[in-house]
Amino acid sequence: MRKIFTPELSGKKGKHAMTPEIMWALKAKLRESGLKLSKRRIIWAVSTICWAGALRVHEILARHARSFDVTSTMTVDDVKVTDAKVDGKVTRSLKIHLKHPKEERLSAGVTIDVFETGDFMCPIDAFKKWRRDAKVTLDKPKPLFRLEGGENYTGQAFNRDLRKLLKEVVDYEKSPITAHSFRRGLATFMAKNNYSDAEIMRIGRWHSRAFELYIATPREVRAKLAEELAGKVAKYMELS
């Protein structure tokens, strides 16, 4: 079957960025997949949160199905839906606590915000639907993202699911889509829409200094940027 999309190179050989078009295709493939609703929900929630937060996959998912590192794995009480006021309007966000961010070895971790977007890739909407339809009890001491059988949803399992869903969309021999494609995807999209290197580095926390700037940037400013990005995604999809 002819592949529909050729994802864009991120600057590293063999590494490709997720695009809004492929996110749209992924959502369509999930609807057609025949997977149980709870499984579709978890795949889409992880996808949208990784894109919107420019997260590394093991900042959100466990490395092992039957065990986890309490010092680094995201657990149920690490994510909360909250409100933020932006230009006099209240917008929802996910407050995500990263226990062990790569950029800084902070014993207390750090909290980042992922804001609602109102488009088809809205991470708040995806998260709430997954939480509503999850078939496991969300116990605070346990990893947040777990499957129906109780095992942890791992980065490896996520990559495997992406490949099954997108194998007829992208050429995996030439342009594989992996969990890290979401993080690269946001940076690529921002660059195409004329955001400065400083803004891109700050939102993606690409090095220690950018990490410090992210923390120093007021929450309202980050919310406004998320709103602008959502508008650009919507316009981009209309023109595609």
Q: PLM features: residue spans?
A:
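Extended, non-catalytic subsegments within catalytic or DNA/protein-binding/adaptor domains
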Residues: 1-240
